[in-house]
Curated annotation (Swiss-Prot):
ATP binds at residues 30-33, 51, 87-91, 415, 479-481, 495. NCBIfam families: GroEL (TIGR02348), PRK00013.1 (NF000592), PRK12849.1 (NF009487), PRK12850.1 (NF009488), PRK12851.1 (NF009489). This is Chaperonin GroEL. It comes from Thioalkalivibrio sulfidiphilus (strain HL-EbGR7). It catalyses: ATP + H2O + a folded polypeptide = ADP + phosphate + an unfolded polypeptide.
Length: 546
């Protein structure tokens, strides 16, 4: 085990605070409508320009190990807030820095750090309750657009496109963000169930203009194994041909003789068929086939449930009003499944979401819910250059998270006003002793900091604006974009309650740990870290420079 360096009390804390300040100062310049950008160097390609707090925080790594520990702890504040609420990372960092700054002053003055922490925790609990009282539900499209606009750095087009997407696919619908190919943002809504598998042969195409296979009022055959022998398929094909309807086959794979026969039948016009591979892999594939079966009112032909392909009848097939299969995607529109069964399946998947541990699993399950329940909206971000594209895409994703948080827990006045109004709950709050009272005062001072920082980034005097806001009531606050005072809700400056709440709770949690630190242990820098110089090739006589 290598030797360690140990630092104690003020020496340890002062180094940690230096690290906290380096990270927080880099992050807080981005706060508010007049916040500035931060440019991040990349090991290859163009640098990234961002106004997203967590993106800046993630890039910061300090040389001094003790300073770096402080920076990493505050980085945890913004990461946690981003994971829980999807936005509010800069606010959380500003709050954390303020609590650490005020807390360290008190610790240096001889206060008990544990009592200070207890006082801060008490204040945060009271402030969170007050925020919940201030919160108003966010249900209409206008409020959703306003939340998205604020989160996307006052870009109204982003706020509006997110509101449109939510209106079309519902609050539960899946909204994905992709890089577009034009200069403008575009919204593409896919109704019905779409999955990322295209036709297995271009000979299935019947719409040459769109290069797609379009099947109206058709049957759907679902099979969980490979189909290579056409004899297994013949009973189904004959039944479909007699019914005079098209057929979509979804199987693990269709190859060889079976695929060739389907192509020949399609070309000759005997039966209109399209074949695609089943979506997903492994257990997820089985689950998605079952989703499609419930959506179309059919049955997955599987030996696990005692069904075989050669004995399948038309009763086992699903049906849909319309199916469109392109080279890359298949879309099933208006399946013939029973609404009760679809609803039951959605509830079942929602229960699985509650139990899921990984974010990836949750996301995939959420997609399945959306595909069964409504549809999928794709926001295609447009920009002139790749650098702008990346920055804009990050803003759209932030705004999307913020609007989801707003729908979940409601909204409060933005611009730091909600935290100032929540101070009302701390006026009469008392701790168990004097040091806890100081902890409550630290939280009170820290909760003013986001408003002060927003004003400071505008080049105005923070104390003057803060006093004016404190004298006002309700939603009265300062619009940093225009320099006017007024009702923040009416001016469309809203923050999701979940974002403000998470920022305060996470900042207090990590800051409390920092101010109660008494010793720090870090690895000693290794001597002679740089690699030894390699042996030269000696004097190569006779090879003079040209």
């Amino acid at each position: 085990m290598s030797a360690k360096e140990v630092r104690f009390s003020d020496d340890a804390r002062s180094r940690m605070v230096r690290g906290v300040n380096v990270l927080a100062n880099a992050v807080k310049v981005t706060l508010g409508p007049k916040g500035r950008n931060v440019v991040l160097e990349k090991s290859f390609g163009a640098p990234t320009v961002t106004k997203d707090g967590v993106s800046v925080a993630k890039e910061i790594e300090l040389e001094d190990k003790f300073e770096n520990m402080g920076a990493q702890m505050v980085k945890e504040v913004s990461s946690q807030t981003s994971d829980i609420a999807g936005d509010g990372t800069t606010t959380a960092t500003v709050l954390a820095q303020a609590i650490v700054r005020e807390g360290m002053k008190s610790v240096t003055a001889g206060m008990n750090p544990m009592d200070l922490k207890r006082g801060i925790d008490k204040a945060v609990i009271a402030a969170v309750e007050e925020l919940k009282k201030l919160s108003k539900p966010c249900t209409d499209s206008k409020a959703i657009a306003q939340v998205g606009t604020i989160s996307a750095n006052s870009d109204e087009s982003i706020g509006q496109i997110i509101a449109d997407a939510m209106a079309k696919v519902g609050k539960e619908g899946v909204i994905t963000v992709e890089e577009g190919s034009s200069l403008e943002n575009e919204l593409d809504v896919v109704e019905g169930m779409q999955f990322d598998r295209g036709y297995l042969s271009p000979y299935f195409v019947n719409n040459q203009q769109n290069m797609s296979a379009e099947l109206d009022d058709c049957f759907v055959l679902l099979y969980d194994k490979k189909i290579s022998n056409i004899r297994d398929l013949l009973p189904v094909l004959e039944g479909v041909a007699k019914a005079g309807k098209p057929l979509l086959i979804i199987a693990e794979d269709i190859e060889g003789e079976a695929l060739a026969t389907l192509v020949v039948n399609t070309i000759r016009g005997i039966v209109k068929v399209a074949a695609v591979k089943a979506p997903g892999f492994g257990d997820r594939r089985k689950a998605m086939l079952q989703d499609i079966a419930i959506l179309t009112g059919g049955q997955v032909i599987s030996e696990e449930v005692g069904l075989s392909l050669e004995k399948a009848s038309l009763d086992d097939l699903g049906q849909a009003k319309r199916i469109v299969v392109t080279k890359e995607n298949s879309t099933i529109i208006d399946g013939a499944g029973k609404p009760d069964e679809i609803k039951g399946r959605v509830e079942q998947i929602r229960a699985q979401i509650e139990d899921a541990t990984s974010d990836y699993d949750k996301e995939k399950l959420q997609e399945r819910v959306a595909k069964l329940a409504g549809g999928v909206a794709v926001i295609k971000v447009g920009a002139a250059t790749e650098v702008e594209m990346k920055e804009k895409k990050a803003r759209v994703e932030d705004a999307l998270h913020a609007t989801r948080a707003a729908v979940e827990e409601g909204v409060v006045p933005g611009g730091g006003v909600a935290l100032v109004r929540a101070l009302q709950a701390l006026k009469s709050l008392k701790g168990a002793n004097h040091d806890q009272d100081i902890g409550i005062a630290i939280a009170r001072r820290a909760m003013e900091e986001p408003l002060r920082q927003i004003v400071s980034n505008c080049g105005e005097e923070p104390s003057v604006v803060l006093n004016n806001v404190v004298e006002g009531k309700g939603n009265y606050g300062y619009n940093a974009a225009t320099g006017e005072y007024g009702d923040m809700i009416e001016m469309g400056i809203l923050d999701p309650t979940k974002v403000t709440r998470s920022a305060l709770q996470n900042a207090a949690s990590v800051s409390g740990l920092i101010i109660t630190t008494e010793a720090m242990v870090a690895e000693l820098p290794k001597k002679g870290d740089s690699a030894p110089a390699g042996g030269g090739m000696g004097d190569m006589g006779g090879m003079g420079m040209m």
